[in-house]
Amino acid sequence: MIDPVNNFKIPEEWIALTGLPREELEKNVASGMVVVLSDGSVLKRGYTTGTTASAAAKAAVLSLKKKIDSVSVPTPVGLRAHLEVSESSPGRAVVKKILNDHESDITRGLEFVGEAREAEGIHVLGGKGIGVVRRDGLQVPKGKPAINPKPMEQIRAAVKEAVEELGLQGAEVTISIPEGERIGKETLNSRIGVEGGISVLGSTGFVEPWNDHLGETRGDLIRCTDKVVLTTGRIGMRYSHMLFPEYTVVMVGSRISEGLDYASGDIIICGLPGLVLKWGNPEMLEGSGYATVVEMLEKAPQHERLKEAFEMAVEKGKGARIVVIDRDGSVLMDSKSES
């Protein structure tokens, strides 16, 4: 059984621990809407702001010609997302961002409003409640609505479906979020240069049911728990939650040593080899003939420097369990199993 959102092959022992009928679990997993954890827990994913905006945009276009009460839109991972339309009138539709098991998702339940009119070609505009980028260096140019490239592609694809279904030449859609400006003040948007609302985000179309814990709260979070996983990035974050559901998972990036300084109790360091092993031995590639740790792993998986770097990571970990995973979530090295 494979999770289609992250392509993770769910171990049979995890499936057995859920206690759910296999057919029911397979159906839920195939939809992309649930995540299975190593203790058998099944958590509910939600849809991103990008998926919700796509649904509102498509529904608004369809409502130009007919009454709409639900809509299906594409997602970046190839799955279809199915959302209810809470309100519709000619050229206008409202879709609510569905609830999920991510307790800190402050955008849950927000209303997204799409307003459409016929036009030449496809045009997507940001309305009230969608932030505006006020600085250079972000994925979206300065002065533009804070709709990241991937969700913008998703919205345009959804509008294109509606235009083709109705036989129109095109449509202009304005997306707004009535409570977006208020909610935006509770996010980090102002610090990164986005003002006036929230950002429309989402690389997969689905919201994972856990927190990234980005920013200055990380140290406090690590201090306040006695069972913590320090992970290096979003891939590590995703699989750490699945592998170690009883732990608080905190993304520390390359600041593993800093995270360790905050931590006490039962500590796990989990992440991709490029960060974990190079943290163990920053000079492991010098004179090796390999450009990256991944290249060394692929071409010489028994290379002595891999073992040395792992042993050095274990030593630097001062008793922490060190777990190295690949991009599919498979465990490559584990100090617990090797001790």
From Swiss-Prot:
Keywords: Cobalamin biosynthesis, Methyltransferase, S-adenosyl-L-methionine, Transferase. The keyword ATP-binding does not apply. Pfam families: CbiD. InterPro entries: CbiD (IPR002748), CbiD_sf (IPR036074). One of its GO terms (biological process) is anaerobic cobalamin biosynthetic process. SUPFAM superfamilies: CbiD-like (SSF111342). One of its GO terms (molecular function) is cobalt-precorrin-5B C1-methyltransferase activity. It is an enzyme of class 2 (transferase). Belongs to the CbiD family. This is Cobalt-precorrin-5B C(1)-methyltransferase. It comes from Methanosarcina mazei (strain ATCC BAA-159 / DSM 3647 / Goe1 / Go1 / JCM 11833 / OCM 88) (Methanosarcina frisia).
